[in-house]
Amino acid sequence: MQCALYDAGRCRSCQWITQSVNEQLSAKTADLHRLLAGLPVEQWCAPIGGPEQHFRNKAKMVVSGSVEKPLFGMLHRDGTPVDLCGCPLYPASFDPVFSALKPFIARAGLTPYNVARKRGELKYLLLTESQFDGGMMLRFVLRSETKLTQLRAALPWLRAQLPQLRVITANIQPVHMAIMEGETEIYLTDQQALAERFNDVPLWIRPQSFFQTNPTVASRLYATARDWVGQLPVRHMWDLFCGVGGFGLHCATPQMQLTGIEIAPEAIACAKQSAAELGLTRLHFQALDSTQFATAQGETPDLVLVNPPRRGIGKPLCDYLAQMAPRFIIYSSCNAQTMAQDIRHLPNYRIQRVQLFDMFPHTAHYEVLALLRRSI
């Protein structure tokens, strides 16, 4: 992938950009083999790649500069701003949005936040696009509610320029820290969730719910999990750290009893909406801590699927799963190092198959899916 920002030395986020995609996949595969060394693997499935560029469905832009000439991108550690509107990871459909937002900021009087002076209102712009219908969600991350009236008054102009904006919010983040969002979300549109669809499964994206940033590879990840579960005798399944329900909604059948657990209420609201659309009445999603939920249960499902954050599921949940002893565990991870640590805390399980998904091209990161079968 060619990137003018990288060539000019202005951005180094894609640290592997000088390597070919095949070289990157080989290096990531070797890393996964290294991390799982000593753990018997029955089947290594071929790695899954995706597009080299224009694949991201989300932009997280620091806003700097002035109200008349705002700049969208990032700040180096010394405070130097870098315009990332031309980042080749973004789809071309983002270009008109960035172009319209620059004059809009002046219209709304949204002064960019100055980190050094601790002054200004607009901190970030968060843009998400649905690959299903091209609809977009735009979030203005503000220091306070001071400019809300002006923002609301100027919105008709922006929506006339960009009818693809379905969901618009103001997120209030008052803390002088590099935190992307605050707890308060104020909806500026009637629609509150963005419709997405992977493999004919309806999904919903809300402002504070996690959603994969590479939809092409994510859809293949979910489809693979569905295929694996479909080959197993599963009538009762848990989907822990379920997010908006992507895995559970793909794997569920009308006869299956499935419980999805996620600590974020916004994500659970999305999962419930999708389950209702699919008519799956035996799916139950709850906003709870996954470890606390699991350790409080007296029943053992046939399969437990876990999709934890980078820190992994941790030893307490590993110990409980080992004691509870479901027949199968599917582990989806964005950090193979913590996944390998967790699997080593499950001594009575063998890795039946494992597959790498190149969710994050041009970086050292990748997603991995592993199917574990109880050996005794």
Swiss-Prot record:
Active site (record annotation): 334 (nucleophile)
Gene3D superfamilies: 2.40.50.1070, Vaccinia Virus protein VP39
Protein keywords: 4Fe-4S, Iron, Iron-sulfur, Metal-binding, Methyltransferase, rRNA processing, S-adenosyl-L-methionine, Transferase
Function comment: Catalyzes the formation of 5-methyl-uridine at position 747 (m5U747) in 23S rRNA.
GO biological process: rRNA base methylation
Gene: rlmC
Broadest EC class assigned to this enzyme: transferase
Highest taxon of source: Bacteria
Catalyzed reaction equations: uridine(747) in 23S rRNA + S-adenosyl-L-methionine = 5-methyluridine(747) in 23S rRNA + S-adenosyl-L-homocysteine + H(+)
GO MF terms, alphabetically ordered: 4 iron, 4 sulfur cluster binding; iron ion binding; rRNA (uridine-C5-)-methyltransferase activity
Enzyme Commission numbers on file: 2.1.1.189
Identification of the protein by name: 23S rRNA (uracil(747)-C(5))-methyltransferase RlmC
Family to which this protein belongs: Belongs to the class I-like SAM-binding methyltransferase superfamily. RNA M5U methyltransferase family. RlmC subfamily.
SUPFAM superfamilies, A to Z: S-adenosyl-L-methionine-dependent methyltransferases (SSF53335)
NCBIfam families attached to this UniProt entry: meth_trns_rumB (TIGR02085)
HAMAP family: 23SrRNA_methyltr_RlmC
UniProt binding sites for [4Fe-4S] cluster: 3, 11, 14, 87
Source organism: Salmonella typhimurium (strain LT2 / SGSC1412 / ATCC 700720)
